[in-house]
Structure formats: C-alpha cells, structure tokens
Amino acid sequence: MECATTATTPWERVRQRLREEIGEEKFTSWFARMDLDKLTADAVQLSVPTRFLKSWIQENYLPRIADIWAEESGAKRRVDLAVRNAFARPVALKANTVREVVTERTDMHSGDTRQQSARISDGRSTDARGADGRGSDARAVEPRAAAAALSDAVAGDVASGSPLDARLTFETFVVGKSNSLAFAAAKQVAESAPGSAPVFNPLYLHAAVGLGKTHLLQAIARAGAVGGRRTTYLTAERFMYGFVAALKTHSAIAFKDALRTIDTLVIDDLQFLKGNNLQQEFCHTLNALLDGGRQVVVAADCLPGELEHLDERVRSRLAGGLVVELAALEEDLRLEILKARYQTLTEQHPGFAVPAPVLEFLARSVGQSGRDLDGALNKLLAFNQLTGEPVTLEMAENAVKDLIRPTDPKRVRVDDILRVVAKHYNVSRADLLSQRRTATVVKPRQIAMYLAKTLTLRSLPEIGRRFGGRDHTTVLHAVRKIDGLVNADRALAEEIEVLKRLALEA
C-alpha cells in the first residue's frame, strides 16, 4: 500500500483515501482505471473506460469521492464522471507493439525501414510516391498492416488478463471450516501439471461479498502461471470490455483465439455478465475450453441456477462441474483472519498495538466478511494514529460501533424466498421474475423483494439482479412500499411474519 506521504496532489490524495477506505482489492477492480481529465473552478471531470464502471461508481461512490475531494483540496467542487473511448486506452498501451509490427510488415513490401518508420510515427510521407517510387504500394499496405497489428494488440491486452494483487496467494489465505473445501479444490486445480486432464471442470465458487472468492481465483491464476500453465484471470467486466473493444476494432476472431488457446481461464464476478451477444460469446468460449480439456474456474455471488440473466445452457454447463460455496466465516476463522491482518499492519505501522481481548471482541462482534474485519482494524489504526489513544477494549467498542452486528442471523437464500412467496400467493417463480405488472403479481413480487432485503445480507443492486435484472431503485421502492403497508395493515404484517418464518425454515 502506498504511504500517505507520497500523495502530493489533491487527486493523488483522493485516490489514496479511497484505497485505504475500501481496500486494495476493491480499489484495483473499480478505481484503478479512473482518471482525472479536467479541473475547473467549480468542477472535477473524471473518466472511466466503460459505461458499466461509470454506472457502478455513480451509484455507489461518487458522493463519497466529492466529499473526499473537498476535504483534500479545501474547495467544494462538483464531481462529474464520463466514459472515455472504450478501446483507445488498450491500443495506446500497446502503441509501441503496433508501431513495431506495422513497420515490420510494411518493410517486407518497401525494403526501406527508415522511410516506413517515419510514416508510422509521423502519420505522413515526405513524398506522395515515396523516395523509391513505390509510395502508393506502401500506403496501400499500411492500413492492412495497422489493422492486423491493432487486432493483435487488443486480443493480447485481453489475454493478458486483469491485474493480480500480489497479496492474494494460497499462502496468505486463512483456512477454516467454512472455506476448506473451496481452498482444497482451488489448490488442486492450480497445482495440476500442464497438459494433464482437469479433475474439477469447471470449478464454480460462490459466496457473498468478502468471503474469499477473489482471493482464491487470483491465487489460482498466480500459481498456474508460475507452474507453466497459460492462465488468464478476468473479471466479468474486463471480459465485457474486451469483447466490445474487439468488435469495435474488428478483432473478434483474434479475441476468441486468444481466450480459447489458453490452459486455464479464470472468470470473477460472473453475475455482472450481461447482454445477449456477450453471453453467447462466453457460452462458445466456455464450451470450446471445456470440450478441449482446458480448465475453467468461475466465481459468482450465487449458485449457477440462480444466475437468472444467463442463458440456460451456460447455467447448466457451470452446474455440471464442481460447485462449492464459501460459507459465512465462523468466529474461530474470523479471529485467525484478524490475527493475520493485524500482523501485516504491525509490519507497516510498528507502533500499532492491539491487545488479544480486542481481537477476540472484533471476531465475536464485527461483520460477516473479511472486508468487515479489515474495516474494523483500519478504524482502530485511524483512531490510534489520529488521537494518540492506545487501543483498549473500551476504545474499540466506540470506534467500531457502527460495524457491530446485533446477532448472527440464519442465512436465508433469495431462492428460498422466491419459492415460499410463489407458493403462498399461487404464482410461479417465473411470474415473480418477469416484467408483468398485473396486481396479482406486483404485490407478491414487492413482498419478495422486501423479504430479500430484511432476511438476507444482499445489497439492493444484488437483489435487483436476482429479480430479473431490475434496477436497485425498483427494489428500494418495493421495500418502502411494503414497509409502509405493514405499518398500516395489521393483517399484512401478520402475513409477512408467516412468510418470514417459512423462509427461515426453508
């Protein structure tokens, strides 16, 4: 992690604050490609490469970015977020490669290295016909060579995969009862010899946020590369971005070939993969890899059958492999994770001391995920460094009071809620997920959304995706609507209590 002292400009300090607040993993996934484009007296113009990133950041973090900017710059400005050209960035990153390939290919026709290099780098020729009298032939070759090089560059950029966090290895993964099977399966996949037949294929890991899916996937990718396997790790967002870029640069064939000739494909956050063309391409890629005996590893926040927006063929193929859940972290595992994270923090901040009873309190009381535990330790570190107050149990209780969970609720699945509500109101599951607006469907659907919000740990956007890909505002409207009706209608309140009990017993 960068030290705060290295951030000299307001924008660098904003990025540093975001990294510290949300963690390196999430920062790398969502904010690493966000750029500061323009700064005026009243506005900050930021940009990201995709509409998906723009939508997610606007929905979840834009107000926070504005607040941090005001704090770090001393001036309150409006923060705007735009989408920059979807494929200019990877091409720019590969500019030298493109230039070299084009020069090499045109040289075969012109025989003059310096003249062709000048044409590529300067975008012009010194003479309409060229010094050797063959200028028109060379110019005819250049667009074809440039297009071929551009195709190679885009495909290579995707095949190189999403960036890996150096901290996410098998050695740093803390194993407990809730994740031991997933860890063992992931390790066996990663350690299989190049060319050997996959044992678990595909390997499908699912869990709620912050329980270790990404950690295991990146560990597989890193170990596979070290072991000599051609391994590519991609987030679903990166896969979508690469496919769109390939279409725009007419390099779809190169894109497909780049992915279908690797040994191991690792896809993270599959629940974000949307769009018929994208799903069709993923389906073809998945089939090509599996049929060719190559390893596929996928992670999502739900079971394959619950990915309602995905094609049924994809869900069926994913369900046909080894499906493993990383369950909620048990208290003993939470304590071990805290000890490991604390050890890392003490190496970075030697004066930071947390007594064992405080770590035990955090393990017993805070959150449901590794990220919750990270947040709690970071709060203690901030309190300690900003106030100079030593970490005690009393100080910890005050510092992390907003992170303390009242009880450990039984985990309820959205699938269970859909089944219970559909049966109770005599409608089908398909009705609840459909776009139908009849009264016999709308009210049960809203009640199901309300129950999903009150009985599960899923966010509004996650619930929306599970209900036929709806927007989070639709879920919020349903929750508020039913909440208001429950307060005014005693019969409905009792009915919902019955549904809650049925869902908890499912």
Swiss-Prot record:
Residues 103-142 are annotated as: Disordered. SMART domains: Bac_DnaA_C. GO terms for molecular function: ATP binding; DNA replication origin binding; lipid binding. ATP binds at G210, G212, K213, T214. The keyword Aminoacyl-tRNA synthetase does not apply. Residues 103-112, 121-142 have a biased composition (Basic and acidic residues). It is found in: Cytoplasm. Residues 1-77 are annotated as: Domain I, interacts with DnaA modulators. Residues 163-384 are annotated as: Domain III, AAA+ region. Keywords: ATP-binding, Cytoplasm, DNA replication, DNA-binding, Lipid-binding, Nucleotide-binding. One of its GO terms (cellular component) is cytoplasm. GO terms for biological process: DNA replication initiation; regulation of DNA replication. Plays an essential role in the initiation and regulation of chromosomal replication. ATP-DnaA binds to the origin of replication (oriC) to initiate formation of the DNA replication initiation complex once per cell cycle. Binds the DnaA box (a 9 base pair repeat at the origin) and separates the double-stranded (ds)DNA. Forms a right-handed helical filament on oriC DNA; dsDNA binds to the exterior of the filament while single-stranded (ss)DNA is stabiized in the filament's interior. Belongs to the DnaA family. Domain I is involved in oligomerization and binding regulators, domain II is flexibile and of varying length in different bacteria, domain III forms the AAA+ region, while domain IV binds dsDNA. This is Chromosomal replication initiator protein DnaA. It comes from Xanthobacter autotrophicus (strain ATCC BAA-1158 / Py2). The lineage of its organism: Bacteria, Pseudomonadati, Pseudomonadota, Alphaproteobacteria, Hyphomicrobiales.
